[in-house]
Amino acid sequence: MEAELFHAGARAAEWLRPLIRRAGGPLRCENVVVLGEVPGVRHRDLFAWPHWALKNLYGPVGIMVGKFHEGEEETARGGEPVPAAPVSFLPVRAAVRRRDPAFLHATPGLAVALASAEDDGRDVFAHVPHDWQELRAWTKRLRRPERPSTGSETTWASRSWPGS
């Protein structure tokens, strides 16, 4: 399921890249939605690896990838409650270079890359392996933010990844 989620996110990002440069482009967004349950896997865990890989691949070309989990309540930076998502989804959209880096405070290198991003048409997969398992291994080597995982004593950086 992770492979399909990653593939759908990459397709959404590639679909958006040429559209963002057109009129109204910065307002475009594609949502990759997961409906139903995956036996034995929480959506939070299912989204973790594909989300991290997509952020690192597409942030440097100005694409922001987020993640929201069904029913999860969050608080905005200003302290206001954010309505719970009705479904789990990955929003894939044009980055707002002045504001989005603030969402990446736990990964300063990625924040800098997003703030200065310019889509020059590069192949974001040119420098990464194309084999699925090798791509997962490449992603695991990227610096992950050190923050507690919800409901767990481990950090997100040290957690075990499904299928690894």
PLM segments and residue spans:
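Expand to "…catalyze enediolate/carbanion chemistry for C-C bond making/breaking, isomerization
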Residues: 1-164
